[in-house]
């Protein structure tokens, strides 16, 4: 007798047919506390318990991408399970994949892990691909587009920024794409339908379900942003889009975040890591230099009473701290990227650098138009000594700069995704590039037994460096009053 039946409802949801007891077990298994819920207004107001429930007990529906995890759950409890035949794996061999790739006449060889990732995606018909920076993610996306692109099955490629709209178009043309690539972002036509469209998610998330019915395949780059309600809304509205893939360089350590992504896109596909790519010489060698700035007893005492926002404001306005970052950037050889989080801090650093060097100093933030950002990116790649002061939110995601030698992480962050993405900006290989150096700037304002936020976040980053097997060294620098 079957205990659990997984029945396909549409491309987004499955229905779980079972008795009430098993339903409650499954609902509990797929319920998670949302990270940071204690600081959210609804939780503070007592309107929400801080949990996200992926299984709806009103209709026993759950994201279809979680079928594999539900099957594992049932087998662990000896439940007999019946899986809808439409949810199974497709037959697609390595040999078939190689023949298909050969027919594309690509300008270079597809790496082994790229081939295997492509095959796994096709077999599953969906998937969440963990693809480190410079692992050739855009080529895998291109292969999927060409494989699924037949009459009546156009591809919608969703990226987080207008810079990536232009960059993805350039990558596809480099691979030999002859199709017209329609770009959708602010000020562009959103109703034109063609073989492939590249769009920012901000441009389309308010569109009705009917608009998404026109697409046969949806691919989301930087899919970890799906924790934002807008991308979740897009994927939930695309109820008839069977081929769906998410690509990301990393996931947060939150189980809730991971489960939502798998639910929307499918099982995780991870076939290579950053350290493996460095070892295989596909990426530049990485050196992480952790610089811990030390402050006077007077300043430690002054900062000991500050909350997080106040500490960040105190640090970013600290004259000697900003001078240290400026001098560090000016002392480095090669192209340097200085990443900031707050606009006022970035503007101050940019002004300081311009006062000392008017040549090849650039500024990039959300206010800079996408085409202008792309021009700056191209300029950097043709220079040997430039400094770009850039918003971490804009430049840590997906921007492809080959000739980048140094990165200065000027603003504290404990976000695993943000840190790994920032490091990833400098790992692409170039003929004149020996390695990439990542400068992790943190602050020791410890007073008595109280450890400040910047130092706490630094300790979490060190744990990340150890986990990722990055080569790092810690240096302490005294900032004189």
Model-derived segments and their meaning:
Residues 166, 181-193, 347-348, 359-396:
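Conserved helicase ATPase core of P-loop NTP-dependent helicases/translocases
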Residues 123-146:
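Walker A/P-loop
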Residues 216, 224-289, 465:
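Post-DEXD/H (motif II) to motif III coupling segment of the RecA-like Helicase ATP-binding lobe
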Residues 425-459:
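Conserved segment of the helicase C-terminal RecA-like domain
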Residues 138-174, 343-344:
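Conserved Walker A/P-loop ATP-binding site and its immediately adjacent core
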């Amino acid at each position: 007798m079957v205990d659990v039946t997984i029945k396909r409802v549409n491309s987004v949801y499955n229905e779980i047919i079972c008795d009430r007891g098993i339903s409650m077990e499954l609902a509990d298994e797929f319920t998670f506390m949302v990270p940071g819920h204690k600081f959210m207004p609804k939780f503070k107001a007592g309107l929400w318990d801080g949990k996200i429930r992926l299984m709806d007990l009103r209709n026993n529906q759950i994201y279809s991408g979680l079928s594999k995890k539900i099957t594992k759950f049932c087998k662990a409890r000896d439940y007999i399970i019946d899986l809808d035949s439409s949810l199974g794996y497709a037959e697609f061999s390595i040999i078939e994949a190689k023949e298909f790739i050969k027919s594309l006449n690509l300008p270079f060889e597809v790496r082994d892990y790229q081939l295997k990732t492509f095959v796994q995606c096709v077999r599953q018909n969906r998937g969440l691909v963990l693809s480190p920076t410079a692992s050739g993610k855009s080529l895998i996306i291109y292969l999927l587009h060409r494989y699924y692109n037949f009459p009546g099955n156009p591809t919608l490629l969703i990226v987080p920024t207008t810079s990536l709209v232009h960059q993805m178009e350039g990558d596809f043309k480099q691979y030999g794409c002859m199709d017209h690539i329609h770009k959708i972002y602010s000020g562009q036509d959103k109703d034109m339908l063609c073989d492939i469209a590249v769009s920012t998610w901000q441009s389309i998330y308010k569109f009705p379900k009917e608009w998404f019915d026109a697409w046969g395949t949806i691919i989301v780059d930087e899919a970890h942003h799906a924790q934002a309600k807008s991308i979740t809304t897009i994927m939930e509205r695309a109820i008839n889009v069977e081929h769906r893939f998410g690509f990301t360089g990393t996931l947060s350590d939150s189980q809730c975040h991971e489960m939502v992504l798998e639910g929307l896109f499918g099982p995780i596909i991870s076939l290579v890591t950053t350290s493996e790519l460095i070892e295989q010489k596909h990426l530049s060698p990485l050196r992480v230099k952790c610089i811990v700035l030390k402050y006077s007893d007077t300043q430690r005492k002054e900062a000991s009473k500050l909350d997080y926002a106040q500490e960040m404001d105190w640090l970013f306005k600290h004259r000697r701290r900003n001078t240290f970052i400026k001098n560090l950037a000016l002392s480095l050889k090669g192209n340097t990227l200085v990443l900031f989080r707050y606009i006022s801090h970035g503007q101050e650093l940019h002004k300081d650098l311009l006062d000392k060097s008017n040549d090849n100093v650039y500024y990039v933030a959300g206010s800079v138009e996408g085409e202008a950002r792309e021009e700056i990116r191209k300029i950097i790649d043709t220079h040997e000594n430039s400094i770009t002061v850039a918003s971490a939110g804009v430049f840590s995601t997906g921007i492809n700069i080959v000739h980048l030698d140094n990165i200065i992480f000027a603003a504290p962050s404990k976000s695993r995704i943000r840190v790994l993405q920032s490091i990833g900006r400098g790992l692409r290989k170039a003929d004149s590039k020996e390695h990439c150096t990542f400068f992790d700037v943190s602050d020791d304002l410890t007073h008595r037994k109280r450890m400040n936020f910047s130092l706490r976040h630094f300790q979490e980053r060190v744990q990340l460096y150890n986990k990722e097997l990055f080569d790092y060294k810690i240096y302490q620098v005294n900032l004189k009053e």
